[in-house]
Amino acid sequence: MAHTRSAKKRIRQAEKRRLLNRYHISRMKTAIKRITEALKNKDIETAEKLLPLAQKLAYRAAAKGAIHKNEAARRVSRIYRKVNAAKASLSQ
């Protein structure tokens, strides 16, 4: 257990940051999972509607420092590629 006031404050701050990071990452992952589930069910229209939200949440998590900006870009890129591939396979 921390003894100094500054160490105790740091523990409080770290816990707050951990919870906020978890919140942002969880929302982003849930949005991506909803798109993935829609693609599994061949529901491309729903997946396309959810794309902007997932993108927004990923970039917001990066802006808040929960994830690196390159990770956010990579996640968005991958989910867009999946949706576009599903759309292309449906049109053929």
Swiss-Prot record:
GO BP, sorted A to Z: translation
Any Pfam family: Ribosomal_S20p
Record keywords, A-Z: Ribonucleoprotein, Ribosomal protein, RNA-binding, rRNA-binding
Single GO MF descriptor: structural constituent of ribosome
InterPro entries on file: Ribosomal_bS20, Ribosomal_bS20_sf
Gene Ontology CC entries for this record: cytosol; small ribosomal subunit
Source taxon at top rank: Bacteria
Keyword RNA-binding (UniProt): yes
Function (record text): Binds directly to 16S ribosomal RNA.
Family stated for the protein in its record: Belongs to the bacterial ribosomal protein bS20 family.
HAMAP family the UniProt entry points to: Ribosomal_bS20
Name of the protein in its database record: Small ribosomal subunit protein bS20
Upper lineage: Bacteria, Pseudomonadati, Aquificota, Aquificia, Aquificales
